[in-house]
Curated annotation (Swiss-Prot):
Gene of this entry: pynC
UniProt-recorded name of the protein: Methyltransferase pynC
Domain of life: Eukaryota
Role of this protein: Methyltransferase; part of the gene cluster that mediates the biosynthesis of pyranonigrins, a family of antioxidative compounds. The first step of pyranonigrins biosynthesis is performed by the hybrid PKS-NRPS synthetase that condenses 6 malonyl-CoA units to an acetyl starter unit, to form a 1,3,5-trioxotetradecane-6,8-dienyl-ACP. The enoyl reductase (ER) domain of pynA is likely to be functional during the first two rounds of polyketide chain extension, to generate the saturated C-C bonds of the alkyl side chain. PynA subsequently forms the amide bond between the acyl chain and L-serine.
Chain positions recorded as S-adenosyl-L-methionine binding sites: G199, G200, D225, S254, F255, R270, R271
Single GO biological process annotation from the record: methylation
E.C. number(s) listed in UniProt: 2.1.1.-
A Pfam family per the record: Methyltransf_2
InterPro entries: COMT-like, O_MeTrfase_dom, SAM-dependent_MTases_sf, WH-like_DNA-bd_sf, WH_DNA-bd_sf
Disruption phenotype: Leads to a small accumulation of pyranonigrin J and the formation of a desmethylated product pyranonigrin K.
Alphabetized GO MF terms: O-methyltransferase activity
Organism: Aspergillus niger (strain ATCC MYA-4892 / CBS 513.88 / FGSC A1513)
Source lineage: Eukaryota, Fungi, Dikarya, Ascomycota, Pezizomycotina
Amino acid sequence: MSPSTINPESSPLHTYYFSMVEMSIMKLFLDHKIFTLIPTTPGASIPVTTLTTTLNASPSLLTRLTNFLIASGVLSSPQPGHIAHTPKSLQFTDPTSYQALFFAHIFDFFLVPAVKWPGYMAEHGLNEPTSASRTPFGYAAGYPDKTLYEILETMPKRAAQFNATMAASFQPMPVLGMYDFSWIEKLADEERMAIVDVGGGKGQALKEILGAYPGIRPEQCVLFDVDDVIREAVAEAERDDDETWRTVRKIPGSFFSEQPVKGAAVYHIRRVLNDWPDEDCVTILRRIRDAAAPNSRVLISEQILQEEPSLAVAALDLWMLNFGGKRRSEGMFGELAQRTGWKVNGVFRDKESDTGVVELVVA
């Protein structure tokens, strides 16, 4: 039985099928910048034969592809053999636009790995990835034992696309307004480190905290991240001639290895656990627990999964499955804490978003 013999009113099959076809053609048009070749002047069109010459493409193939996009309403055909833009296709005329970047991104980084889910699950069972180096993305890319970032190092073009899309789609996640850091200001006379920003990048969040709480001494704070990132942070501090930021200690290392700063008051970990499977998160939190004092705290700043997430959040959570990451609920953070010698002492939520701070204390 072909798909055309099924009554579309009694089955969602056609909706799924047509979406697959449309997405596949759209990706081709984006890759070959075909949307940019169609005139954007209202009422203007272009002969398909002109496109075939410009693209050195098969006339038969291009006709078949455009036939579907016309039928689906992505393109229009004001006269036989011509195509023109619609409001849908006009969104993709700029290859650097958010729409164009994100479409290609979800195709390459969600759809392609998702197509391989059956094979991945047949090999690993119906289980979440237990390691960032054993993921659906790696399985689909032909690197079943490498992490996303290790794989991207072998794909410069794909890596550039990934980074461009992340930059275009990045929505700032609040650092302040949820948790009251003022108690840390009272530690100014102590010798211990006040804040260790674990996996803190170039220190964007730590800078915000120090700016809002001037009683926290910068010299009592540590930025901890991998070598390359710390080098960039040091260079940035020198370039900006920021004396306050220069006094913050910057220590390179891996959060999977021993935490070099012992007994800090706070180990701040923001937008990190979100990217890793449970077992890797357990390792990260255990390394901190091994370094902690009896009264140390961990502040996990992340987007917190609701018990009944929205469609968009549920989709994002499954997108992260491809790389081994996941969104977590309060209960999930509690389970991680219990496994690593911590306990949840409080959850402080942002009123405008799903962002929150989960405070852990030694169990």
